Swiss-Prot record:
It is found in: Cytoplasm. The lineage of its organism: Bacteria, Pseudomonadati, Pseudomonadota, Gammaproteobacteria, Enterobacterales. It comes from Pectobacterium atrosepticum (strain SCRI 1043 / ATCC BAA-672). GO terms for molecular function: acyl binding; acyl carrier activity. This is Acyl carrier protein. GO terms for biological process: lipid A biosynthetic process. Keywords: Cytoplasm, Fatty acid biosynthesis, Fatty acid metabolism, Lipid biosynthesis, Lipid metabolism, Phosphopantetheine, Phosphoprotein. Belongs to the acyl carrier protein (ACP) family.
Amino acid sequence: MSTIEERVKKIIVEQLGVKQEEVVNNASFVDDLGADSLDTVELVMALEEEFDTEIPDEEAEKITTVQAAIDFIQANQQ
C-alpha cells in the first residue's frame, strides 16, 4: 500500500492535471499548481473519498499546500 503522501500527491496530479514532478510538498494549489476555487473544492472531495474522512469547511480552507493536505490526512486517520 502506498504511503499517505504518495496517495495525496497522486490525487493532486489527477485532479489538477499537473505533472508529478510539480507536486512538491511546499507547492501551493493556487499559486504554484494553477488551481482555482472549484479545483480546490473538487480536490478536497477527492481526498475525503480516498481516505474515507470528512474535511470540515473551516479545515478545508486551511489546506492550501500539498504538505497541508498530507498533514491533515495523517492527523485524521483512524
